[in-house]
Amino acid sequence: YPFAFLSLDNCSHNGDKIKEAILTFADEWAANGVADKGFVDYVNDPQKVTFPWSMIDKITPRSSAKVQGYLKELGFGDTELIHTEKGTYAAFVNAENAQYLVIEDTFPNGRPALEQAGVIFTDRNTVDKVERMKVCTCLNPLHTAMAVYGCLLGYTLIADEMKDPQIKGLIEKIGYQEGLPVVTNPGVLNPEDFIKEVLEQRLTNGNLPDTPQRIASDTSQKVGIRFGETIKAYGDKAKDLKYIPLAIAGWCRYLLAVDDEGKHFELSPDPLLKDLQAALEGITLGNPDSAKGKLKSILANKDIFGSDLYEVGLGEKIEGYFDELIVGPHAVRNTLVKYVK
């Protein structure tokens, strides 16, 4: 029978990932005699079984008590937040109005006309381009920059950060000034319109209880895509970038777990957190000399950024920003005021 496995997981090339998982089971079943080789051939036949790629974009943070209150006022009954002993979580979903779903149009047995509901069907290459537009330029880099600086400046809501002229100015410059000139244009969506909606409608949405602490999670796994790809796109001109390096310096400053008032705060989870903090051990607020040579193992790490930031001419610039960010209390704010005109 012809069949399509459509993944809506929010990750790049999600169709390949579900295909790999299913083939792992199929191969093991064949090896154990549970299924014959013909079954493996069937799963591998693109005329019969497909694994379309998709790109989904709709900011959906953890369910909010504020939204729960709204729902109760409206008479919505089932609003309990369920936490299980195994750490799983079941609840209502609070999300934004904006939504994008782009799907590779490979369905061997036909499909519903979901384009009538706004779904974009296209080829695999275009799905990938939409993903790159969002993740490398128009949304995710802005999210990460405002997350690390938001934590340093004591914010707990993304919408509140958008009222901060320096944070708002920083992400506008990262997006419009440094991102759009090298953006991947997918054709089916306009990058400039997309980023305008992000900045003017999505991130400013006070009814969406998204937090910089959530977005700051796993930053070491994100910066290579969110900043590293744009750095690569600039080639020899990467050394002229100003605001992406400032965002990276902000992440390094964030890793000290000391806010702009000089008070300790809890860092969000990250698989490399212990190693990153060990590399920065000994750096103290108020003593820029204590940072000498400490950032190199992070900024030169190609596994993190996709390139050695010293080799592309940004390492020393980021170190300079970082030194300014640790001059003392309020140095984060003062540095942003200085560079974000």
Task: Name each region found by the language model.
Residues Y1-K341:
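Substrate/ligand-engaging "lid" and interaction regions
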